[in-house]
């Protein structure tokens, strides 16, 4: 992923480590290690622009890429949806945007058993939903039950299969109580999660929106427990527990979120609003960026990378990004049912040429799904 970004002196929203600048948490998609160039352009326009007005207005203008299909954390399946959802909903843990190490989120602390199977999370007593309701451990259990409900058909339900007996409920047709899924609310502020196996990266996994809570009364009001496409995610209906509230959503135009006064750490949220602009064309995004309409873009066209490297080498910055591009073949149909054909395609794929001449973003040729040192 390639980004264009202008530096401003505001944080986007809550960052636990107050010494860190504004940033969106880095995203984890797949398992392979990539390098991401981030371009910082300093400079202004002759007339006041969105970027120049940002210091006074305290509004971040964010190029979103594609229009999110869902803003429901249990149905979303895209980076663009992720960028909006993390402004609206907070999970049990957060992360340091520089080290990616887990930090307290809705849970102010947690305990891990010696065998690594039992995690006990202590929910903040001052954590609230945007309508003022308290955030409780029961909300998380309800949310896990919802995303694992096979009738909801969530694409990311398998992210929760690490919970003990989660598969029995999700795939084998057992009822929640009968399956005895390893998610129990001991009381309003104590949540216990039991795993099938020790999972060293479990806390990092909780940063994925599939683990985020949904407001149970709102889900029930709109009959959304096992239905897709209900209106609970529209402005005025959306109840989240994150630093921002959904204010406006014009499809393929703008998604605006405004500061949530009920957020438990609202005092550290410097921005008053974020405006996300779904702009699928990387060239259009770049023009919007250069005109001062956007603070940052979602991507950069590969055919622009060489120019930017040659003409602005001092402002291109590469950052690590986790993601994997791969080819998938139908192994049951000719010719790919023949292992020799698959091997030939594998040997004929010049990964180095692809990253140097096609993607051009400093990506690393992938020989497997997991990069060295991660698995």
Feature names for model-found ranges:
Residues 32-43:
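Bacterial N-terminal signal peptides
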Residues 46-48:
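Bacterial signal peptide processing site
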Residues 57-66, 118-120, 140-143, 191-192, ...:
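Short, well-ordered beta-strand elements
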Residues 63-114, 237-241:
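N-terminal lobe/hinge region of extracytoplasmic solute-binding protein
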Residues 108-159, 192, 285-288, 335-337:
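Aromatic- and charge-enriched surface segment that lines or borders ligand/interaction sites
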Residues 140, 189-191, 290-299:
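Alpha-to-beta junction loops
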Residues 157, 268, 296-375:
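Local pocket/hinge segments that shape ligand/substrate recognition
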Residues 166, 178, 188-189, 195-269, ...:
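Gly/Pro-rich hinge or "lid" segments in bacterial periplasmic/extracellular proteins
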